[in-house]
């Protein structure tokens, strides 16, 4: 893959930034694409742009605001509480988001001569999002190839690893401190370690604490 080109679906968060560093190691040329779907914190887009600029990555932002018209949710509406009731999808789930994001990323990839698409979806720390499942990604990969008659390959480096292992991967890629300090995972829009209270921050911190304990134990 070293001689090929890839497009990374990029939000500026921990997972997609780790995937960006992974792609930079795997491919000769990498571009990033971010989607503006009127998410609650526009800082997410600014954060992604700043990271791409710092890493020298060509960055495209696509307007997907129609998603908010079709599927209002807690990620786009300040009047909706972030909740996750047992047996129900979290209020942060956006119907069709990864389906649309990966489809538009594929269109962009074909236009820029890339056949590889990288996304940070994960089934291990799966929050109940059906569009983060491996079966969905594999199915969409086939559909995209048929729809555009093009040999796309969707890569999911984080699919079978948990948050602690994602931190480990960022460390192996030499990006641990960068990811910890400069990414935005927090639902409340706080860069770095975040608010510590929202579900995204709690998951991120639990993974970080586990990895740091493992790393310390390995060094003793």
UniProtKB/Swiss-Prot annotation:
Catalytic activity, reaction form: 7-carboxy-7-deazaguanine + NH4(+) + ATP = 7-cyano-7-deazaguanine + ADP + phosphate + H2O + H(+)
Cofactor(s) needed for function: Zn(2+)
Entry protein name: 7-cyano-7-deazaguanine synthase
Reported function: Catalyzes the ATP-dependent conversion of 7-carboxy-7-deazaguanine (CDG) to 7-cyano-7-deazaguanine (preQ(0)).
Residues that hold Zn(2+) according to the record: 186, 195, 198, 201
HAMAP family: QueC (MF_01633)
Lineage: Bacteria, Bacillati, Bacillota, Bacilli, Bacillales
CDD domains per the UniProt record, alphabetical: QueC-like (cd01995)
């Amino acid at each position: 893959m070293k001689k090929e080109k890839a497009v990374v679906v990029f939000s500026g968060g921990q997972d997609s930034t780790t995937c960006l560093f992974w792609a930079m190691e795997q491919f000769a040329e990498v571009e990033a694409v971010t989607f503006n779907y009127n998410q609650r914190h526009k800082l997410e887009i600014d954060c992604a742009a700043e990271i791409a600029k710092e890493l020298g990555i060509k960055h495209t932002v696509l307007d997907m605001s129609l998603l908010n018209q079709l599927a209002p949710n807690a990620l786009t509406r300040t009047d909706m509480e972030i909740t996750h009731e047992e047996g129900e999808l979290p209020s942060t789930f956006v119907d069709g988001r990864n389906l649309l994001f990966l489809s538009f990323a594929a269109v962009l990839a074909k236009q820029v001569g890339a056949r590889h698409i990288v996304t940070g979806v994960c089934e291990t720390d799966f929050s109940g999002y059906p569009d983060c499942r491996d079966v969905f990604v594999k199915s969409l990969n086939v559909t995209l190839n048929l729809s555009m008659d093009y040999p796309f390959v969707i890569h999911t480096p984080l699919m079978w690893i948990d948050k602690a292992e994602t931190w480990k991967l960022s460390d192996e890629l030499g990006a641990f401190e960068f990811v910890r300090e400069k990414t935005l995972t927090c639902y409340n829009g706080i860069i770095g370690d975040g608010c510590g209270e929202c579900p995204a921050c709690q998951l991120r911190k639990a993974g970080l604490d586990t990895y740091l304990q493992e790393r310390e134990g390995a060094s003793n």
